[in-house]
Regions:
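Core SAM-dependent methyltransferase catalytic element
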Residues: 209-212, 226-243
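A short acidic, Gly/Pro-enriched loop at the edge of an enzyme's catalytic core
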Residues: 105-116
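A short glycine-rich, Lys/Arg-flanked "PGG" loop and its adjoining helix->strand segment in the class I
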Residues: 130-145
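Conserved class I S-adenosyl-L-methionine
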Residues: 1-48, 61-65, 145-179, 220
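Short alpha-helix
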Residues: 193-210, 216
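A short SAM/SAH-binding and catalytic strip from SAM-dependent methyltransferases
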Residues: 116-129
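Class I SAM-dependent methyltransferase SAM/SAH-binding core
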Residues: 51-55, 59-106
């Protein structure tokens, strides 16, 4: 049974699934996809065929990108409509990717199942992000890596609310969003426990859980998104190893 907040988040992403899928498909077909692949591959363990879990796969961007690179990838998401888009994207490229409906905070995988767990723009949506991090640690093999790309989106919302004269940052992934969906996005963001200073919060939690080599990189957004990155909430990368 998922919580009321998780139901709210799932409903929000259901409404956005089709347009969001179009954005991610376009990324795969332009230079954005190659930028992401280079960024991820420089962080991956030196092994040709990794078993990778894409948590919060959404419409399957990371899963497709890494499966095309020869890795064994599974993608999970809480929103069935997003998974439908992901399966379609994989089928169009003749890729054998397993997509499952699953809560990122309560994985149904056995311990030490994956070489890599990665995620993009997910942790900010989770009601219990520390619980999710503990689950991701559990399913990683010893020596495995966690890669998380996210942003302090609450900072962007707070900035807009505190200074209404300043034009808000608008993520390019929000193209076509209605005012009602934007308001829902803001309310969900500010409700989450993770609406605090990041990535410092994440690094503290990861070390407490037992990860080692915990690092963050605040320049990821500039390298990949360039001018499309948010001013008030730039994308950061986090990586940590399970000893």
């Amino acid at each position: 049974m998922i919580s009321a907040m998780e139901q709210r988040v799932r409903h929000y992403w259901t409404l956005r699934s089709h347009d969001f899928g179009a954005v991610r498909k376009n990324e795969l077909e332009n230079e954005m996809g190659q930028k992401w692949l280079r960024e991820i591959e420089r962080l991956l363990p030196e092994k040709e065929h990794l078993r990778i879990l894409d948590v919060g796969t959404g419409t399957g961007f990371f899963a497709v990108l890494l499966a095309q690179a020869g890795h064994q990838v599974e993608g999970i998401d809480l929103t069935p409509a997003m998974l439908e888009e992901a399966r379609l994207l994989a089928a169009q490229r003749n890729l054998d990717i397993v997509f499952r409906e699953m809560d990122a905070q309560a994985l149904s995988y056995a311990e030490e199942s994956f070489d890599v767990v990665l995620s993009r723009n997910l942790t900010w949506t989770l009601p219990e992000p520390e619980k999710a991090y503990r689950e991701w640690f559990r399913v990683l093999k010893p020596g495995g890596w966690l890669l998380n790309f996210d942003a302090d989106y609450a900072a962007n919302v707070r900035s807009r609310m505190q200074n209404c004269k300043v034009a808000p940052d608008s993520p390019y992934g929000h193209i076509g969003m209605t005012d009602a969906l934007q308001q829902e996005n803001d309310e969900i963001t500010l409700t989450m426990d993770i609406g605090q200073l990041r990535p410092a919060w994440d690094l503290r939690v990861l070390r407490r859980i037992g990860f080692s080599d915990c690092r963050s990189d605040a320049t990821v957004g500039q390298r990949i998104l360039g001018a499309l990155d948010l001013t008030h909430a730039p994308m950061f990368g986090i990586w940590a190893r399970k000893a």
